[in-house]
Design a protein with these regions (language model features):
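A short acidic, glycine-rich active-site loop
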Residues: 201-210
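Short, well-ordered coil/turn residues at beta-beta hairpins
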Residues: 13, 178-180, 184-185
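Core beta-strand elements of the Rossmann-like FAD/NAD(P) dinucleotide-binding domain
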Residues: 3-7, 170-180
Length: 237
């Protein structure tokens, strides 16, 4: 069985980035958005199991460039400073938005965020993905296809105009046409040997289901790739 779908914006990957992108588009336009997620957006991506801190928040007395300097030093200078700065400049705004959606951020008796060091906020973030999933469900003009795996782009005249995928449970083959495509499939943690043996082999920061498919699709389609010279490896779970 095949199914053809048309949308304004296709978001491939329904993790934190994909969900937040959909919310941002929904709040700022009337574009139709389709999220395709190979798992389920309620518990998918790097933050599927939650997180207990925000490690790049710009606390009082600090500025975005301070985070850039820290990350650059930590990576021996192998960074795109412009990308780091852009992310750092927006993180506090995103944090405020997530708190309004229901994320619990710990505060002291004066109502100020509880910080650890120069760039860390303590949060109760075990439900960060369900919170985002609920917001996406309520967002206007946003549709979600869970358990649909996108495996390649549709390219015409050197421009990506959609993608192809299949339903993991239904077996339906999808041809999706889109005016714009956002790839939010995460990294490639699943390509590498885990740092824990046996039954604990998936006890790691990043989900083993991040296979690098988004990278591969981009490379095959001729997309410009960047920052591949730097690979972060979590030395602990």
């Amino acid at each position: 069985k095949t199914e053809k779908i048309s949308t304004d914006v296709l978001i491939i990957g329904g993790g934190t980035a994909g969900c937040y992108a959909a919310l941002t588009i929904s709040e700022n336009s009337d574009k139709k958005v389709l999220i395709c997620e190979k798992a389920h957006i309620k518990r998918s991506g790097c933050l599927a199991a939650g997180v207990n801190a925000l490690n790049a928040y710009i606390v009082e007395g600090r500025k975005p460039q301070d985070y850039v300097d820290y990350a650059k030093k930590d990576a021996d200078g192998i960074v795109r400073e412009d990308l780091l700065l852009t992310m750092s400049e927006k993180l506090n705004e995103v944090t405020d938005r997530l708190e309004k959606l229901g994320l619990v951020i710990l505060k002291d008796e004066n109502g100020k965020y509880v910080t650890r060091g120069n760039r860390n906020l303590k949060i109760n973030g075990e439900n960060i993905k369900p919170i985002l999933a609920d917001a996406v469900e309520k967002a206007k003009n946003v549709t979600v296809l869970n358990r649909v795996n996108i495996f390649d782009y549709s390219v015409k005249d050197n421009k990506i105009n959609g993608a192809f995928g299949f339903g993991i449970e239904s077996g339906i083959f999808y041809t999706i046409e889109a005016k714009a495509v956002i790839i939010a499939t995460g990294g490639a943690a699943g390509l590498y040997k885990p740092n824990n043996p046996g039954f604990s082999r998936h006890k790691m920061w990043y989900p083993p289901f991040n296979t690098g498919a988004g990278y591969a699709m981009g490379i095959r389609a001729g997309a410009e790739m960047t920052t591949f010279e730097m690979r972060f490896i979590a030395l602990r779970c």
